[in-house]
Amino acid sequence: MVLNPSKYQDTRTWKMTPAMIRARKPFFKGNMLGLTLLLGVTGSVYYYTYHFLHKDNDFADVPIPPIDPQELEALKKEYEAKKKA
């Protein structure tokens, strides 16, 4: 499938012709404003989600029981054995 050459592009370099550049010029500022608005809203949603909803303290009130060193060594050996298998 061969693309037909556009009259708004140079057939040798595929760059826009001066006519195409002139046709797009009035829309440039509006497009940049829309892009800025879209990126701003998206960034704001991500910022809000990460910073305000990321405060995960569900288990902050659950105390962690102390563990003695022998039990810790036994758990480490068990973990290493499962890791190798």
Swiss-Prot record:
One of its GO terms (biological process) is mitochondrial cytochrome c oxidase assembly. It comes from the Eukaryota. It is a single-pass membrane protein. The chain crosses the membrane at residues 27-49. Keywords: Membrane, Mitochondrion, Mitochondrion inner membrane, Transmembrane, Transmembrane helix. Residues 50-85 are mitochondrial intermembrane. It is found in: Mitochondrion inner membrane. Residues 1-26 are mitochondrial matrix. GO terms for cellular component: mitochondrial inner membrane; mitochondrion. Component of 250-400 kDa complexes called cytochrome oxidase assembly intermediates or COA complexes composed at least COA3, COX14, COX5A, SHY1 and SSC1. Interacts with COX1 and MSS51. Belongs to the COA3 family. Required for assembly of cytochrome c oxidase (complex IV). With COX14, negatively regulates COX1 translation and is involved in MSS51 association with newly synthesized COX1. Present with 2530 molecules/cell in log phase SD medium. This is Cytochrome c oxidase assembly factor 3, mitochondrial. It comes from Saccharomyces cerevisiae (strain ATCC 204508 / S288c). The lineage of its organism: Eukaryota, Fungi, Dikarya, Ascomycota, Saccharomycotina.
